[in-house]
Regions:
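Mature extracytoplasmic/periplasmic domains
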Residues: 304, 309-376
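Short, polar/charged alpha-helical segment
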Residues: 31-39, 46, 51-72, 165
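Conserved C-terminal helix/tail region of periplasmic/extracytoplasmic solute-binding proteins
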Residues: 264, 370-402
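A ligand-binding cleft/hinge motif common to bilobed small-molecule-binding domains
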Residues: 112-114, 273-292
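N-terminal secretory signal peptides and thylakoid transit peptides that target proteins
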Residues: 2-17
Length: 402
């Protein structure tokens, strides 16, 4: 898969501020005004609440923000970010143009696309953050492109994700390095692999990866969805799934509900391969004694789909200043290093470590843990977010079970 095409699709002109964040903050009166206004505000941070590790990390951040800035951070736990989009959309329709229910949101992909296009986001603001100067916009271009949609300062990058497979090396000593090798492997090991049922997002990501590896037309997939070319563009996906499904768990007539269910099935030996969007997921679970130490993580050699997840501020947030301060702290080396540590979360950083001071760089020093990816593959950008719903609907029409 040509990496040059990916970068051409992604790169946006511009560069981050070339000064240290602390010095920038001291010399910028606008930021000083934001800091002063933020003190005493409460930030209602709407974010997925399905992980104890992530929830604990946000509790730690709340303590730091209270101590440093007198800001109260309240984690509003979501099952699906689409809940937030619907709520903010309803508030706008009802004329609630200020004093909104959400101040900060963990978003990306189709949710960002919807909020940006419907005028549901405050901004631009993110590239004005002092901490944004350390973001690796050159080496991680998805920090400025979200599912092929330019960010344009409307959300702040928070963490990285990439489709990653993991397997018990005691059962799978040689792991498939491509979708074609995976198909050959499942033919020889029927019933030992599956993927989460779309529209679960990792299941949908698996579909997009399969399409890209099997001849999906990139020019179309990285542009907004077109009904006129849908059948032709997605034909390689359905052909590949028709070949794959008979060899999956339950012969492809049932699908696991979630990556969590798949992980447990792998731990129980029912599945031998699984997948995740966090390259450190298996390492986290090995450290927690939930997976055996023989589990290894890997990515397809030519590359796998990856993206950045972001922080957005709804247009009608009541605490916009404090929300910016929270985002700035979550982008700091201290917060990013703790987030990257598998003992706390294991979410890869968006920062360029070579931009950091020696002391801040040292915060990220850690030995490679069992289960971590040892040979990272190139990151492929997400297809345009408008392709998600049509692909999911067609998958359900063809393969969905009630």
């Amino acid at each position: 898969m040509p990496q040059t095409l990916n970068r051409r699709e992604l790169l946006i002109a511009g560069s981050a501020l070339g000064v240290a964040p602390f010095a920038w903050a001291q010399s910028n009166p606008d930021w000083q005004r934001i800091e002063a206004a933020a003190r005493g505000q409460t930030v209602y941070f709407n974010a997925w609440g399905g992980s104890e590790r992530i929830n604990a990390y946000l509790q730690w951040a709340a303590g730091e923000l209270a101590q440093r800035h007198a800001i109260k951070l309240e984690h509003v736990k979501l099952g699906d970010t689409a809940e937030l989009v619907r709520r903010v959309r309803a508030e706008k329709a009802a004329g609630r143009l200020s004093e909104g229910s959400a101040d900060l949101a963990w978003i990306n992909g189709e949710n960002f696309l919807a909020m940006k296009r419907e005028g549901l986001l405050f901004g631009p603001w993110s590239e004005k953050l002092p901490s944004h100067a350390n973001v690796d916009t050159a080496g991680k271009p998805t920090t400025r492109i979200d599912f092929s949609e330019p960010v344009e300062g409307m959300e702040a990058p928070w963490g990285m994700a990439q489709l990653t497979f993991f397997a018990d090396s005691a059962r799978v000593p040689v792991q498939p390095a491509s979708m074609s090798e995976l198909l050959e492997w499942v033919r020889k090991n029927p019933g030992r692999f599956s993927y989460p049922k779309p529209p679960q997002f990792i299941g949908t990501t698996f579909l997009k990866q399969l399409l890209l590896e099997n001849g999906g037309e990139r020019t179309a997939l990285y542009a907004p969805h077109s009904a006129e070319v849908f059948a032709r563009t997605t034909a390689p996906l359905w052909a590949a799934l028709d070949a794959l499904h008979p060899h999956l768990w339950k012969q492809g007539r049932q699908f696991p509900a979630s990556p969590l269910a798949m992980r447990q099935m792998l731990a129980d030996g029912e599945l031998w391969l699984s997948l995740t969007f966090n390259p450190n997921e298996a390492a986290n679970q090995i450290a927690a004694k939930a997976l055996p130490a023989t589990v290894v993580s890997y990515q397809h050699a030519a590359g796998t789909i990856g993206n950045t997840h972001f922080l957005g501020i709804p247009f009608n947030a009541r605490a916009k200043e404090a929300a910016q301060l929270v985002a700035n702290f979550l982008l700091s080396p201290l917060a990013q290093a703790r987030k990257a540590d598998i003992r706390h979360w294991g979410d890869p950083t968006v920062l360029a470590l070579d931009k950091l001071s020696a002391a801040d760089h040292a915060l990220f020093a850690a030995a490679v843990a069992p289960g971590q990816v040892t040979r990272p593959a190139p990151t492929w950008p997400e297809p345009h977010g408008t392709w998600v719903d049509p692909i999911e609907r067609e998958w359900i029409r063809r393969y969905g079970v009630t």
